[in-house]
Amino acid sequence: MKKLLSALALAAVVAPVWAATQTVTLSVPGMTCSACPITVKKAISKVDGVSKVDVTFETREAVVTFDDAKTSVQKLTKATEDAGYPSSVKN
């Protein structure tokens, strides 16, 4: 029983370490004017777990930093698509 409690306590402490902050660059080719990045940034910023968003019209890219324990790339691309700007991960 003591070992079980120790294992559970260790898991509770270590679990947050497994979550990682990731940065991904999304290609957003549908941005056609200088106001589009504002809409894209607002849409991505509303996704739970996103900590930073930089959207550039000239390159038609969004660089997003997020907590992968709270969200995923799929949720980010869905957010841009729902805002009218389909996106994909830039390779």
UniProtKB/Swiss-Prot annotation:
Metal-binding as UniProt keyword: yes
Keywords: Mercuric resistance, Mercury, Metal-binding, Periplasm, Plasmid, Signal
Signal peptide: 1-19
GO CC, any one term: periplasmic space
Localization per record: Periplasm
Main location as per UniProt: periplasm
CDD domains, sorted: HMA (cd00371)
Gene Ontology MF term list: mercury ion binding; mercury ion transmembrane transporter activity
All residue ranges annotated as the HMA domain in the record: 22-88
Residues reported in the UniProt entry to bind Hg(2+): 33, 36
Gene3D superfamilies named among the record's database cross-references: 3.30.70.100
Pfam families referenced in this protein's UniProt entry, alphabetically: HMA (PF00403)
Family, as annotated: Belongs to the MerP family.
Entry-linked NCBIfam families: MerP
Description of how the protein assembles with itself and partners: Monomer.
Function noted in UniProt: Involved in mercury resistance. Acts as a mercury scavenger that specifically binds to a mercuric ion in the periplasm and probably passes it to the cytoplasmic mercuric reductase MerA via the mercuric transport protein MerT.
Protein name: Mercuric transport protein periplasmic component
